């Protein structure tokens, strides 16, 4: 019988929000089980001084959490689905995906301007090559620069004047209650989101059938 489930997650505000959302969903179904949050630093959290698209490799934001799962330091791993590698593993598996949040990207700006109102003298920050390519497709004269850090860190950089605008995932902004910074939601016709964006995935060890029976109930 399972009495405690250890939930592994990154340590950012957004990651902790998502891990706690998983915990609350599990509590509703299994109130007699105890749950603990285990914070784990990933390579993506540690490397903050390089362009993300040049630094990224398989499992950039999840490998250390998956390693802790395989080593049974945690019982389940909570990820943003878009961060998971495409390749399947025989050792671990996705047991559940929570109801998907907003899949769109949003544009944030200090001046509350919309993207169409931006000029080449104003700097837009993004860590994503996908977003940069689409921004320049919308307007080749836009100035787009790399930005790193968690959601709140990026917004602080914008407020402090390092950037005039940002393109980010709507789900993360909404989950942290930061909608007040949104200038507009970007339709997928002009800014196609990442696969799985807005969804939260829960991984387990493939041979843990008892855990699987619990976690799949919140799928």
List each model region and its residues.
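Domain-level signature for soluble enzymes in the chorismate/prephenate branch of the shikimate pathway
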Residues: 1-219
């Amino acid at each position: 019988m399972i009495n405690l489930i250890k939930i592994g997650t990154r340590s950012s505000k957004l990651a902790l929000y998502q891990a706690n959302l998983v915990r609350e969903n599990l509590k509703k179904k299994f109130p007699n089980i105890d749950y603990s949050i285990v914070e784990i630093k990933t390579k993506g959290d540690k490397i903050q001084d390089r362009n993300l698209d040049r630094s990224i490799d398989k499992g950039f934001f999840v490998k250390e959490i998956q390693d802790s799962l395989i080593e049974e330091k945690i019982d389940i791993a909570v990820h943003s689905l878009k961060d998971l590698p495409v390749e399947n593993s025989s050792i671990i598996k996705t047991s559940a995906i929570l109801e998907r949040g907003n899949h769109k990207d949003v544009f944030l700006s200090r001046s509350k301007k919309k993207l169409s109102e931006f000029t080449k003298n104003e700097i837009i920050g993004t860590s994503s090559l996908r977003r940069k390519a689409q921004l320049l497709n919308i307007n080749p004269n836009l100035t787009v620069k790399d930005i790193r850090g968690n959601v709140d860190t990026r917004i602080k950089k914008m407020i402090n004047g390092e950037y005039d605008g940002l393109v980010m995932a709507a789900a993360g902004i909404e989950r942290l209650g930061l909608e007040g910074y949104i200038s507009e939601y970007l339709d997928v016709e002009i800014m196609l989101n990442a696969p799985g964006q807005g969804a939260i995935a829960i991984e387990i060890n493939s041979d843990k059938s008892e855990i699987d029976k619990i976690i799949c109930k919140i799928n």
